[in-house]
Amino acid sequence: IREGDNSLVSLKDKGYDTVAMHPYLANGWNRSKVYEKLGFDKIMFLNDFKQEKVVRSYVSDEEFYETIISQFEKKEKETPLFVFGISMQNHGGYVNESFENTVKATNLNREYGDLNQYPSLIHITDEALPTFINYFKNYDEDTIIVFFGDHIEFDKYKIPFFIWSNFTSEEKNMGLTSINFLSTMMLEEAGITMSPYYKFLAGVQKQIPAIHAYGYFDGNDYHKSNAVEIANNEVLNDYWLLQYANVFGDFKGSKLFN
């Protein structure tokens, strides 16, 4: 990660204040240095949370949501705010004996502690989420929430996500996609003018809705990818070249990506 690398922190150029928060240790994955290089205006880690509502020694999602809300209550009224938050409550592993599982799997020939604990934790999140959403339902500025995970179901590489806003009542199934397209989807929902790079991603998504490290989904079938197949696929090859330029090229200050 280098200073000025492309990310949604570039919303600062459109007048946004930007906040990154993660209720755990600042040195994990060098997050403190990475967030600083990305240019966030404010960075919050474990010591910046009250730590009054804890689940399995982690800050609960309830407190995490409350802390996000507090940032919106403190912000300047005329200044839009972008918050990137990574929660901690439901992080693995899932065999903490001090935690009381409220969800129990039945009709099994043996006990699977993690099979009970993970859905029990998700249930706690489900109970906290409506209060969070309801706060922004009544918020006096247009607001979008993008909610997704990245740590589960390794065999399927599929996890649920949703994009919610307080200014539209339309519901639609977004279909199968991948995490690299979520930022573009959010910008489109917000009606924010996108850079050429994000416009390119929007075009890629229409032809290849989902991509990950081992393959891609073309809307009909799943394909395992390799260097030869990427080179022979014009869309994938263009994406690979542009992504390489994004990561390794010198485009600081360029409007191509940000």
Where are these predicted regions, by residue range?
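Solvent-exposed soluble domains appended to multi-pass membrane proteins
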Residues: 1-258
